[in-house]
């Protein structure tokens, strides 16, 4: 059945409207991405300073091993996973890569579902797991595009507290790491116990730089939970940056596809119009010949 010229014109107009919407969403995502990247850079400066301070306190000046439980691996009976996804769609494969990886982790390490504890940041992840009968210990929805620490403080502090209370024996964060506008990397990073403070980076003469007014263990008791919380917050910022990049790329792809559809429909319209004109000319000539 031939498509009428009016139908094609309607499709062109509708696709143009969609293209304008996706183009606007692309520009909004680009603005969000710029702010997220700046926040991520600022956090990295802070994180490097705190990591260096902790490393110096732990390993500098010939310090012995700490007995703080946040630094000591224990027998693993339960593992906690913080899964960071978005609250909405329109972000390409951003969520699917995370959810697929977490399900693979579950099948490999927790095939019977035992010892698998989850904290969800983002509604897409929470809904995905609930639909499969997996109830998160805690969930957070409605995260801002540039979340402040105050917005996530409760869930982060609660998670670290659950580790300290041995609700699980190790903690991982599953999220997409932002590489650039077109690329992100799925990461599963261990947060607790803290194991990535390299002794080789310690300042052997740190005592000449600052003097501890209380014992090292008392300082670590306060500093280590704050460090763990800040590292989780850093992963959230990183994930949000990757989400904004994915949203921008998805909307750019949608806009490009809409332009291609408009071009194809325009060609179809011109051909149909040409065929209609040819048909009219043929009918006029045939009518004139019949009158002779």
Curated annotation (Swiss-Prot):
One cellular-component annotation, GO: plasma membrane
Principal subcellular localisation of the protein: membrane
Gene3D superfamilies in the cross-refs: 3.40.1380.10, ATP synthase, gamma subunit, helix hairpin domain (1.10.287.80)
Keyword Transcription annotated: no
GO aspect biological process, one term: proton motive force-driven plasma membrane ATP synthesis
Keyword RNA-binding: no
Subcellular compartments: Cell membrane
Disulphide connectivity of cysteines: none
Keywords attached to this entry: ATP synthesis, Cell membrane, CF(1), Hydrogen ion transport, Ion transport, Membrane, Transport
Record-level Gene Ontology MF annotations: ATP binding; proton-transporting ATP synthase activity, rotational mechanism
Chain segments annotated as transmembrane: none
SUPFAM superfamilies named in the record: ATP synthase (F1-ATPase), gamma subunit (SSF52943)
Membrane topology: Peripheral membrane protein
Pfam families hit by this protein: ATP-synt (PF00231)
Domain of life: Bacteria
Family: Belongs to the ATPase gamma chain family.
Assembly and interaction partners: F-type ATPases have 2 components, CF(1) - the catalytic core - and CF(0) - the membrane proton channel. CF(1) has five subunits: alpha(3), beta(3), gamma(1), delta(1), epsilon(1). CF(0) has three main subunits: a, b and c.
Name of the protein in question: ATP synthase gamma chain
Source species of the chain: Streptococcus pneumoniae (strain Hungary19A-6)
Upper classification of the organism: Bacteria, Bacillati, Bacillota, Bacilli, Lactobacillales
The encoding gene: atpG
